[in-house]
Amino acid sequence: MPADDPGAANGSDGGAVSGVPTGPKLITTRFDQADGYTYDGYVRSGGYEALRRALTAMTPDAVHDQVKTSEIQGRGGAGFPAGVKWGFLPDGVFPRYIVVNGDESEPGTYKDRMLMELDPHQLIEGVVLASYAVGAAQAFLYVRGEMALAQERIAQALNDAYANNLVGTNILGTDFSVDIHLSWGAGAYIVGEETALIESLEGERGMPRLKPPFFPAAKGLYLQPTIVNNVETLSNLPWIINHSGQDFYDLASPTSTGMRMFAVSGHVNAPGVFEVPNGTTTFRDLVEAPEYCGGVRNGRSVKAFIPGGASAIWFFPEHLDLPLDKATVDQAGSMLGSGAIVVMDDTTDMVAACWRVVRFFARESCGKCTPCREGTTWLERILKRMLDGNGRPEDLATLVDVCESISPGLAWPPKQTTICPLGPSAVSPIVSAVERFRHEFDHYVEHGRPIDGVERHAIHGTSGVAVHV
Amino acid sequence: MSESTDDTQASDADEDVSADDVDAAVDEEVTEEPEPEDDSIKLIIDGVERRVDPGGLVIDACNEHGSYVPHFCYHPRMSPVGMCRQCLVEVEGPRGTMTVVSCMTPTADGQVVNTATPAVKRAQEGVLELLLANHPLDCPVCDKGGECPLQDQAFSHGPGESRYVEQKRHYEKPIPISDLVYLDRERCILCDRCTRFADEVAGDKLIHFVSRGNNTQVMTFPDEPFVSYFSGNTVQICPVGALTAKPYRFKARPWDLDQVESTCMGCAVGCRIVVQASRDEVIRYQGVDSDAVNWGWMCDRGRFNFEALNSDQRLSEPMIRTESGLTPTTWNIALDAAAGVLRDALATPESVGVLGGSRGTNEDAYAWAQLADVMGSSYRDAQVGDGLPTGILGYPRATINEAANASTIVLMGPDLKEELGVLYLRLRDAAEKRRSRILEFSATETGLTPYAWKSIRHEPGAQSAAVAAALSDEAIADQLAAGPVVIVAGRGNLAESPDAVIAAVDALFDAVPEATVLPALRRGNVNGALLMGMAPADDEHDALATLQAASEGRLDVLILVGSDPLSDCPDADLARRAIAGVARVISVDTHPTASTQRADVVLPASSFAEKSGTTTNLEGRVTDVNQKVTATGTSRPDWMIALDLGVRLGERSFPSDHPLRGAATVDDVTEIVASTVEGFAGASHTEVKNTVDGVVVPAHVPRATSAGFSPPPRNNYDYRLVISRKLFDDATGTQMSRSLANLAPGGGLYLNPLDVAQLGVEVGDDVTVTSAQSTVVINVAGDERVPRGIAWSPFNQAGASVGDIVDAGAGVTDVRIERAG
Amino acid sequence: MSRLSDHHVIVANDIIARCPRPKSALIPVLHLAQEQDGYVSTDAMEHIAELIGITPAEVYGTASFYEMFKFEPVGKYCINVCTNISCQLLGAWELLEHAEERLGIKSGSTTTDGMFTIEDVECIAACTEAPALQVNYRYRYRVTNEDFDALVDDLRNGALDDEIPPHGTLARVRQTTPDNWADTGRRAQEAVDAR
Ligand SMILES: Cc1cc2nc3c(=O)[nH]c(=O)nc-3n(C[C@H](O)[C@H](O)[C@H](O)COP(=O)(O)O)c2cc1C
Ligand code: SF4
Ligand code: FES
């Protein structure tokens, strides 16, 4: 069993073996450097040069301009261009805040944790750059509660960065000052949603706020203007400043710029996290190329795959050749989301897979909106009953109908009767699976067991988490 | 005037007896579309063009214009949370048609809103089905059944039947979350109304959502109950039967309830309420949303003291004293006895005193004042030495709304949270919403201290000096100059001279001449009674002077009209000597009190809800009070008793041309008041009956004068005493209400913990407290809100008679505290 | 059980002082309480309410939203088996079943000796290393039944004491407030909040 050391990204630093697109590593360069996470290791490998350059030779607007030019899309899920988002801050309203979203919990997603554990200074440098660009008074780095090592490494890195005058008062002798406060969660997926994250940072229950009126850029933390960015998004800033926004833009396709990290898990031979050219690499490249996952396990074939985290509509073999391009994937009816690809081979029990994803959302609903609080649990119960062999013929209709109450029209992008997209996310696996694999559901209802040829899981009535209220 | 309407049920308001978020009368009053005002905006709601004021929410615009939008979490007096998702409507916007929650969507000019498209109906049905999925559907045994927004909307906007066959949520139920409120978590639909109320409105964040997702519940902290003076409001605004009030549980079904709109007379705020009765018994009050006064809220004392009306201790027949004590008799005999006593006394001038009137209506007080006039009695007062001189009504007066919108609210007097609960809510709101800054002068910390911009502590009696010091502070002077200033003035300390307050108010007026005053006298209709003629002409004839005269044997008869000096006069010794020293006592009351025990004639008065009339609140707002149930026993309204007596006094009877001679009904008296009492011309019966908010009348009394007041110097060894009221005390209305009786904290002497330590005593020990007047033994408690060198004790509590050590004649009360025994 | 120790009060006040509003320190301070006692006791919540200036009900309201906070004692080692989709596909339920058998308890409960609690949890961001678990939030990747047994033995005999602290302790390195803490955020926010 590999011990608790974060696996390095199996990056494609060698030449192209199978003709897949290649590019430089931007943010995973220190993943193989044993001391890359330390202050010395970071500085030795060129760290904090971007910050020095920005603070001494660039105006805040110039930094912002580079980010705009790069057209870097947010890596947290929504894919909104960071430069544009920063531009939404209202003029002259202070204090304003930067909030770093390190709550990574979307099923399948695994990259922010690596960035925090293996290269915390890179993130800190990115945060100070962003704070400089927008004039933030303080930044909050919110790390998921369950990530003890990431918290430890960031705490150490922050203490070292302060000691070396890279954060805090008069950074590097300039008159720019900003603090970074490390905060962390305590186990709640919804806190990844930016307004819920803000609530959590305010010491509240992590329940999302309605947008509008609570767009963070206008009314965020303490109702002050606030920028929430993902860890991966901000980790790219040092590279962008060291090179240029244009260099970043030129790396991949014009609709999805730069390099991007993808985690590929599930039924593949060599699951892993890869930093690949955004927009040009295809799903098939990731799944099949020897530099990446090296194909589906046991020589089997893809039955379905989740292209962008548990909230995404599922894709099928015919989608494998789509490029990892936001516009293309949106067009095809799903999303790249948080860069989480989960591959299911032809032995997968689709009802069980669907249930598992729904169960996640049911368990993680914050409880604020009636449709999500009541609906997701209802969906989960029906599916579980089917898995237990107690499905009824009318269940499938009820299932779809309850989905409709949460996400009217079952369209993509989803409409919602809820405040945030969590509720509708529970609808994604159901519409995906029921549409394509209806016979598997019918078979459960009729025979109380899955169709032949799929793997059964030892799912049992679990009580979830210990000693909760 | 309409009866109250439930905000969730505008469509069939007539049958609806719930007063949930009542916005009475307003709907019906405005029957046609208001004329477009200059700044109004246009909305197309369900295809019809409507004009609304800008700055509102779509939900209100729809509901005001007949397109009813179902909702649960939205409450017009709290910030919207968009939680239940029931109020979904379609709004056409630049990005196409959007389904949005109308409770959080601001209106905009030209907005197109649809509330009844198939998509909206589908969405609303879906939400309702989901709300009902885990609901126990135990309507037949639920207090709310019949007036339940969930039930009603399931009927009007629901899918008809549930397909939910899974196991429902189960919780232990119902659980008491306080002395007055039970919680049934299975019925709860998590609308956040009660929790928001506790947080936003009351500031008592003692109930909260706990756990997450499908397990979310409303709960208190383990072993820390929802102790709030305003807990009953959560029951009223709960849109299901999750919160129920102990005093009402299982008492009635809503469809058996009859109701009438009225005004709570529990204190001088005068909250608008509906009085609900079943089988001729009052069983519930609900707050009505009066924009000017209470916004739908009530305090628990006002809400639940209806129990006292039904108390089996009520005085139900007249009594006269015989050898065997107080003996029931007929009205004729009792009235003749009383009249005989008075006729004898009236042979000597100024030998009859009349105290009271503030418990009854304006009409009651008016009739008694008229009787005092014809008897030539100058000794009269609506207070018992526990308020301020009548001249406090003579300053330029502020309304509650003016206070709650002033740039500065100066607090000079009682702890409003304890004495005038809903005024506390309104002023707290003003501070929390940053409309106003509170500048507080007080001897100890009060309920509003946490919300005060500046809270200035002064020694008892030293408020003038504190004002002078404050005025020399630049920040305070700037603030007072920044905009309207309202001074809320009342009697914060019963162990100190009221002159201390008047002197401080005058000092403020010298600096801010354009300030206005909101008098914070506490008793129900004290303002009305004073204006009706129950105000003493001068210091020589006020309540204390009356009691003094009685104690010296100068009075032959003392008439107590709902007044109990033995409990309410701060100088307990004076009250006792007075009651002992006067030859005869005639008591007109609803319940037996310490003073009725001493009476020679007891005349039973009808209580609130048993009689009609008008009342005047602390702003001078005259509103109506209405009868809902038959009077107890043979009791009569006070005004009628005055009239009955007033015709039996021989040559001192009401003259034949006296207007009251012709009064047959209370409405006649209301008209007489309107036509004869200066300032009340606008408060005629028709004017008052047609408005929820009533009519504000001016007070024609001379402004109080203070010759300045400064407290005597103090001796380091002594503590200076503060005696003030708590919301719950030994008052009759509270003690006769089963559910409230135990909420009175009981007597005690509260000292700063450092002083407790310095005295070498432990909390809970008995100490002797010695003033120039007397000595009492009392239990000591530590309280950080009491500054060092000050001793605070709650007034009129069981177990300690702190009144014994107060000398009404002294400016302040200094006491020596020693370990007892 | 207990209020925060003097040392933890110092740490808590340091965190509170860094926050523009005191309540922002609530979750980190709750973690301190859990670090001290292994769970968040009622007394600790009352103490935290005092330190931050809110009601205990507010503390509890926030704390109970988050799954990591326990309000009753759990095992010294909390073993969280991820059963979410990537792990389910690669045998997480079978691993959980083995764990339950091996420890003789159901998921969600604690062994009678107070050593182990098992939970089945949602995705822990180790999807490419499925099936994965955490012991007191320290990762173990691609766990087989044999790995699990060895893990339990090592935990019991103390072989992992250095690596894995008892339940409640997360990061063993804390951010401290340095001399060059700029404090502009807190001061600016306080100015905005001042009435
Ligand atoms: C239910 C939900 C969960 C989310 N979880 C995360 C998360 O764990 N990490 C993250 O960075 N963004 C998450 N997001 C997206 C954030 O709301 C936000 O868009 C993002 O942090 C913005 O950063 P970016 O612009 O750099 O991508 C989530 C959104 C939703 C609706
Ligand atoms: S959709 Fe679900 S998770 Fe999102 S705010 Fe509503 S209840 Fe909470
Ligand atoms: S009333 Fe609008 S969401 Fe509840």
Feature map (PLM): residue ranges:
Chain A
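Hydrophobic alpha-helical positions that pack around
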Residues: 151-278
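Short acidic, glycine/serine/threonine-rich loops at helix termini
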Residues: 78-79, 83-86, 109-112, 151-156, ...
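Cofactor-/ligand-binding subdomain signature composed of acidic, glycine-rich
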Residues: 11-64
